[in-house]
């Protein structure tokens, strides 16, 4: 009688890679005023930039309240960006479920819930961000529909086909797009919508410029070429329905931020990269087929 040797199970794959661990550690300890003071204006804490024409009159008036006016205007511009992304999520019903992937401190999830009245799951690899965002959901009285979880966007563990829509707002540069879009193709129901707003380097410029490399180093990220988004979407059943170049629309935000107390030292780099054509700020919306 022969016996079969017991099967030795493989070691479980790490939840996140060593690189992602370094990113999580950064965001677990990050307390940058540019990510906090703007959210204090109305309780919607965003981790992205703004779009639209700035109201330059905020630079006028009493000097002692000048910075307060600038911060309020910067927040208005970043809220306009969040609303623009939500505009491209398509028709969302109150009983639909959305995924805010790389949710930061949760502002985008709250925007989507306020707009559609829907269920939103926000995910981040930063336990500090998740705890902060869940506290904000409670303060806004929507924690029955908006929940934040400590998860890896490359391997979420959510059920297949469980989401009507998914978005990334300036977070795709932290992951491999081939892995990311494969996971989203699994998570989205057929006909579901994916939206990203992202910085990418311009393929026609050639390789990443000095400014793009500086931004990578500043944020511990790896900015993808524009072409990579469309290549990996095509490989993973995501068909673009809308592409909007927001590069010109984000420049006023950066010019105004450079005049505020919230400067981080990266403002001139962004402005140079946008203006020399090496860096672009895009919205891409795609349907899952």
Give, region by region, the residue ranges found by the protein language model.
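Short alpha-helix
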Residues: 221-237
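N-terminal auxiliary segments of SAM/dcSAM-dependent transferases
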Residues: 2-46
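Class I SAM-dependent methyltransferase SAM/SAH-binding core
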Residues: 97-99, 108-155
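Conserved alpha-helix/loop element of class I SAM-dependent methyltransferases that forms part
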Residues: 55-60, 75-94
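A short acidic, Gly/Pro-enriched loop at the edge of an enzyme's catalytic core
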Residues: 154-166
């Amino acid at each position: 009688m022969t016996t079969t040797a017991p099967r030795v199970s493989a070691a479980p794959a790490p939840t996140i890679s060593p690189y992602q661990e370094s990113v999580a550690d950064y965001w677990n300890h990050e307390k940058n005023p540019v990510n906090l003071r703007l959210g204090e204006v109305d309780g919607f804490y965003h981790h992205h930039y703004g779009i639209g024409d700035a109201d330059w009159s905020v630079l006028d008036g009493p000097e002692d309240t000048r910075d307060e006016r600038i911060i309020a205007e910067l927040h208005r511009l970043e809220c306009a960006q969040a609303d623009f992304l939500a505009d491209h999520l398509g028709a969302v019903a109150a009983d639909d479920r959305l995924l805010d992937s790389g949710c930061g401190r949760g502002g985008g999830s709250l925007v989507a819930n306020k707009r559609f009245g829907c269920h939103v799951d926000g995910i981040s690899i930063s336990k500090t961000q998740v705890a902060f965002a869940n506290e904000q959901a409670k303060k806004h009285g929507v924690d029955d529909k908006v929940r934040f979880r400590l998860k890896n966007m490359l391997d979420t563990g959510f059920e297949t086909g469980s989401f009507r829509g998914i978005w990334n707002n300036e977070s795709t540069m932290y992951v491999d797009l081939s892995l990311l879009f494969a996971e989203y193709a699994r998570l989205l129901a057929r006909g579901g919508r994916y939206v990203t707003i992202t910085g990418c380097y311009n393929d026609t410029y050639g390789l990443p410029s000095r400014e793009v490399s500086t931004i990578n180093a500043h944020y511990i990220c790896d900015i993808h070429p524009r072409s990579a988004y469309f290549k990996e979407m095509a490989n993973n059943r995501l068909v673009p329905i809308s592409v909007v170049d927001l590069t010109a629309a984000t420049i006023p935000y950066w010019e105004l931020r450079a005049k505020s107390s919230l400067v981080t030292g990266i403002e001139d780099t962004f402005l140079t990269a946008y203006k020399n054509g090496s860096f672009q700020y895009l919205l891409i919306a795609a349907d899952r087929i």
